[in-house]
Every structure is written in C-alpha cells, then in structure tokens.
C-alpha cells in the first residue's frame, strides 16, 4: 500500500511513515542512548491516548448497549494490530468468566498469522468479508477495526462489511485523516508521532492500540457487571494461582478469614458470586444462589447494595 497521498498538488507522507528527527542517528547511538530515546518517545503514548478518552468512552457505551442485547465485540486487524486484537480477546474469558464467543479477534491470514507473517494477507478486502461472514455479524455486534496506518485493505473491508450488516463500527488508528478513521462511526486516533524506527508501528502505535483495547474491553465488562468493586468476581479458576486469587478476592471483599473463605468456596462449588453473597449476608449457598437468580445475576442487587 503506498504511503504517500496528495495534498495541494504535493505528496504528503502518512504520519506513521514519517521519520523521527530525534532518532535520525539511531544507528550511531549506544545501547543506553537508544533505550533512553525510546523511553522518552514512549512517554508520549499515554498523553496521546488521553486525548481520545471521549471517543473511547463513546465506543464503550455503544458496545455495552449492544452486548446487553446479545451482541458481541469483534476485533479485526492485520499483523501487529491483528495480534493485539487476538490477545485482548483471548484474555477476556479467563478474566471475566465470559464465553470465548463474546469477544473475538479476527486476524488477516487466520491462526497462522498470530505467530508467522502471512504474505499478502492484509491486502484483500474480500478475505475480510469472507472471514466475517462466517461470524454472522448483525446489528447488535460491535466491530473494532485496528490499523496503525488506517489504510489496511483487510480492515477497511471488514469495516465496510460490518456497516452493511448494521453493526457498530469503531476505528483505532494512528492516522486521523485516514480512510479507516473516516469509514467508522467512531474513530479513536491517538497521534503518537513518528516512530523511533521509521514505520515500525509495533512500537508507539502498537502500545497505544494496546492501551485503547485494555480500556475498551475492561470498561465494557465492568459496565456489564463482571466486577465487584474493583475485584475480578467472575475470573475463571483454571490453575492454582487463580484459585488462590479467588480466595484472596473473597477475603478482600468480605473481610473474612482464610478458613471462612475456603469453606464458602467449597459450599458454593467455587462460585465466587454465590460465596460472596453467602459471607456478606450470612446465608446458605442455596439461598445465596436463589438470591442471585432473583436479581438476574446482578450481584449488587442480590446483596441489597
């Protein structure tokens, strides 16, 4: 994909392809000089993301509204952007106890592209339409297109297809005037400036994307009730570390002892929500479970808070 576009009769280079003056002599720098420079440049990332908080919050509101109607959150990207989407999607089930079908990561080139470059995969809009057709996207879904450049054909094809299906479309790109930013209903465009290594958007642009994805998924899941206070009340307890974390969460939320937390977890069949209600209200596991069902799974309501 060409990195030049015309403006006032002249060709203008995309922001993500411009050279960073501070790193012009990068190949002459010592190790300490390189990492110092990278650290200074990285400090620009959270500031750029902060400028986009209103757009990020609007995106969360839209995603939450649709997920409450049975929709899904779907990330689409290629290369680094696609991998970041797959990573964030894969972390949601163990963190929030949700089905893997609710947050999906779609990457150009398929599973192999997560660990290996797949030549030409990002250059086809048709491939994106094919991949998304298999997901049966509808009006209650939200699709987040991830592309630092904002010009990746695969992502543009995904956005166009999702729009036709009535889904909410969100762009995350480092180029504000890019085709992707213009195509999506909500554009999140952190301007992190040129990279230390020219065009290597796995650096600042990738870091900004990761921060945005953290916010989108975490804020969405919290709004949907998958946290109590700031505790992961629905985490999946698949190993010893997570089982111990569940115990600590219960103790932290209730002020109870280790033995009391362990007993409540056993009696609730390791259901953190039920165990929390038991200890907070001093009731049996069956009564706590019924209270949770009566509150339609709303933990605060079941606790009477």
Regions found by a protein language model. Give the residues of each.
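Aromatic/hydrophobic pocket-lining residues that form π-stacking "cages" and hydrophobic walls in ligand
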Residues: 62, 158, 216
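Residues at the C-terminal ends
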Residues: 68-69, 164
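Short, amphipathic alpha-helical interaction segments embedded in low-complexity terminal/linker regions
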Residues: 220-305
């Amino acid at each position: 994909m060409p990195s030049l576009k015309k403006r006032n009769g002249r060709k203008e280079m995309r922001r993500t392809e411009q050279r960073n003056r501070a790193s012009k002599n990068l190949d002459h720098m010592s190790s300490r000089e390189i990492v110092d420079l990278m650290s200074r440049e990285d400090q620009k990332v959270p500031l750029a993301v902060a400028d986009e908080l209103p757009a990020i919050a609007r995106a969360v509101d839209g995603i939450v509204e649709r997920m409450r109607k049975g929709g899904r959150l779907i990330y689409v990207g290629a290369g680094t952007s696609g991998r970041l989407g797959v990573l964030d999607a894969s972390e949601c089930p163990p963190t929030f106890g949700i089905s893997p079908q609710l947050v999906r990561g779609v990457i150009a080139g398929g599973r192999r592209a997560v660990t290996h470059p797949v030549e030409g995969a990002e250059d086809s809009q048709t491939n994106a339409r094919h991949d998304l057709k298999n997901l049966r996207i509808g009006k209650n879904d939200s699709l987040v297109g991830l592309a630092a450049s904002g010009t990746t054909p695969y992502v543009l094809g995904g956005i166009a297809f999702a729009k036709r299906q009535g889904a909410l479309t969100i762009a995350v790109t480092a180029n504000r005037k890019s085709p992707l930013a213009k195509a999506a209903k909500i554009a999140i465009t952190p301007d992190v400036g040129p990279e230390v290594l020219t065009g290597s958007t796995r650096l600042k642009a990738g870091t900004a994307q990761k921060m945005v994805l953290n916010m989108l998924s975490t804020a969405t899941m919290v709004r949907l009730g998958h946290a109590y206070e700031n505790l992961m009340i629905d985490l999946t307890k698949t190993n010893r570390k997570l089982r111990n974390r569940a115990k600590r969460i219960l103790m932290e939320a209730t002020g109870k002892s280790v033995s009391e937390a362990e007993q409540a977890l056993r009696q609730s069949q390791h259901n953190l929500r039920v165990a929390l209600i038991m200890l907070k209200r001093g009731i049996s596991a069956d009564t706590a479970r019924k209270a949770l069902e009566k509150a339609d799974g709303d933990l605060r309501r079941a606790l009477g808070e």
